[in-house]
């Protein structure tokens, strides 16, 4: 089974990816990891990408697509894959479609984990970190015994700058602007499976598998 997964920051996508690849016995392809491996490993594609990155430029779509194509051609993808983090734009989706067609690969479904914005804000802005030992808490889901104080070492808990409401809203704005056209694109192809991510983790997994006939 060949799948693509989308989901907002704080939507629980990472957790679901782990379960899906285990349940479906397919390979998880995180394009972020793939990118880093190519650059770190000094592959031909990685070296080309590094040139753009060192110059402070965006890596061209055709180079990213070439990396994805190379990754999909590996033996561990023969039983199927879960593509995570790509495409991010409609032109990338079109390029991916053309690549899959060239390779004789059919995309079975596109999974979209949807969570109301208010819930995402609660999840993402509630994190607190200890200044001393780095332990992580959450004001709603894993609150410290004493407000603002680390259970483990008694250190001060603080909110990281990228967890503030303004920063989180900015990230969600970018995500929504990128993803909405993709939702429409895959919806027109009849591939889109919308999953309610505002549920218990196990129920989200159940719904994801049910949408795939499992």
UniProtKB/Swiss-Prot annotation:
GO terms assigned for molecular function: adenylate kinase activity; ATP binding; zinc ion binding
EC number per UniProt: 2.7.4.3
Pathway: Purine metabolism; AMP biosynthesis via salvage pathway; AMP from ADP: step 1/1
Record carries keyword Metal-binding: yes
GO CC annotations, alphabetized: cytoplasm
TM region(s), chain numbering: none
Location of the protein in the cell: Cytoplasm
Annotated region described as NMP, given as residue ranges: 30-59
Region (LID): 126-163
Catalyzed reactions per annotation: AMP + ATP = 2 ADP
Family: Belongs to the adenylate kinase family.
Functional note: Catalyzes the reversible transfer of the terminal phosphate group between ATP and AMP. Plays an important role in cellular energy homeostasis and in adenine nucleotide metabolism.
Name of this chain's protein: Adenylate kinase
Source organism of this protein record: Desulforudis audaxviator (strain MP104C)
Gene, per the UniProt record: adk
